[in-house]
Amino acid sequence: MSRYQATNEPTERERAKAERREALLREATRLFALHGYAGVSLEDLGAACGISGPAVYRHFAGKQAVLIALLVDMSKDIYDGGLKATEDGGEPMEVLARLVDFHTDFSLSRPDILQVQDRDLKSLPKSELQLVRKLQNAYIGLWTAQLAKLHPEATAPSHRFRAHAVFGLLNSTAHSAHSPRTKKSGMKALLTQMALAALATPVG
């Protein structure tokens, strides 16, 4: 190992700090989903991670900074995942199938963060809200580009409406997945089948 590589490895203290930050983000996601952003204090967040409320300031400037990190990072993750799903190209339905696969996996594995976005997005400052909206629009564009190829006779607003309808279907699991009566086994297959049918249905 070179001297350069050695000096760029994180120290034990840096690793511990990074782990604490990730723990705070995980607990914030859970607490915001359960109680809403307004219903959670820094003291609540710190207690969930075994630290005091003021100790949270070592990692974030405040509660709003936690929300910013959660929702901006989530929007980047979704866009990056969608971009990766389209990289190999192919027929429109093939690309859309990969997008559906990615989005369904995301909604089933991270229902809490989707619930936080749905309820607390408007609590972001204006600049961060604009960034999230920009990333969301870019992600929608990945879908509508394929829908335009699949349904060339339809209008751009129609493609956007269809994409949003599918998002509504897939994101609904962010709420139903919390129910103890809901079995995730078989849920992905059913959601995928329904989403693909909605995307493929010819324009009336």
Predicted regions and their residues:
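N-terminal intrinsically disordered/low-complexity leader segments
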Residues: 1-19, 203-204
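Alpha-helical DNA-contacting segments of helix-turn-helix folds
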Residues: 67-74, 117
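Short secondary-structure transition hinges
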Residues: 104-141, 175
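Short, structured motif recognition centered on aromatic/hydrophobic residues
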Residues: 32, 78-79, 96-100, 116-117, ...
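Amphipathic alpha-helical linker/stalk segments
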Residues: 72-97
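Helix-turn-helix
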Residues: 12, 20-23, 27-65
